[in-house]
């Protein structure tokens, strides 16, 4: 269903700020593929999602750079560590409105872990760090919340999810923590909502 939605702008300066923040938290830049194999897509796709995928030369446009990291790991091209990358994210949204889009831009975080427990601990720490970053970007702390989910944590600004964090195994069986470093235009939408209201 498509509603009359106001198209929001992407503020690239927020990515510059987020990059500095996550760099200070130990994350390093990684060049990643924007198209991956179907198993990398399937690995992170929720069971209840019907996925209409964009295909080019037998590869699929990513829904998040998490899949890009999985592809690199599968190919033996991802060293253990803490990585960040920005990709367009293609989604098959059931409802398109002011906060739901078929395409948006997202910085994804990926940190290697030693076990499931370690990966879950790391994802929780990343989610808490994200709340601090969102506050520095201009979202009042009082409207931000950390919500436990079946697979990890979501960060909400009021009733809008602005970050998702969790733990999984790669296709090769290694534990890792993942999360949203920054997503646009949702972060801009949240900032604009409260600008001048503090």
Specify the residue positions occupied by each region the protein language model found.
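TRNA-recognition modules of translation machinery and tRNA-sensing kinases, especially anticodon-binding
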Residues: 1-198
């Amino acid at each position: 269903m498509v509603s009359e939605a106001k198209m929001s702008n992407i503020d690239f300066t927020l990515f510059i700020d987020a990059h500095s923040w996550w760099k200070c938290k130990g994350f390093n830049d990684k060049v990643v593929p924007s198209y991956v194999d179907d198993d990398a897509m399937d690995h992170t796709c929720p069971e209840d999602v019907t996925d209409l995928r964009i295909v080019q030369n037998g590869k699929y446009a990513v829904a998040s750079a998490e899949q890009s990291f999985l592809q690199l790991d599968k190919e033996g091209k991802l060293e253990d560590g803490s990585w960040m990358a920005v990709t367009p994210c293609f989604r098959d949204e059931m409802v398109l409105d002011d906060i739901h889009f078929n395409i948006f831009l997202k910085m994804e975080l990926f940190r290697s872990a030693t076990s499931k427990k370690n990966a879950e601990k790391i994802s929780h720490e990343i989610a808490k760090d994200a709340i601090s970053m969102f506050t520095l970007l201009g979202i009042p702390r009082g409207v931000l919340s950390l919500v436990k989910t079946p697979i990890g944590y979501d960060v909400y600004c009021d009733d809008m999810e602005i970050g998702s964090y969790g733990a999984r195994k790669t296709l090769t069986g290694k534990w890792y923590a993942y999360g949203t470093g920054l997503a646009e235009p949702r972060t801009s939408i949240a900032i604009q909502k409260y600008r001048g209201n503090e």
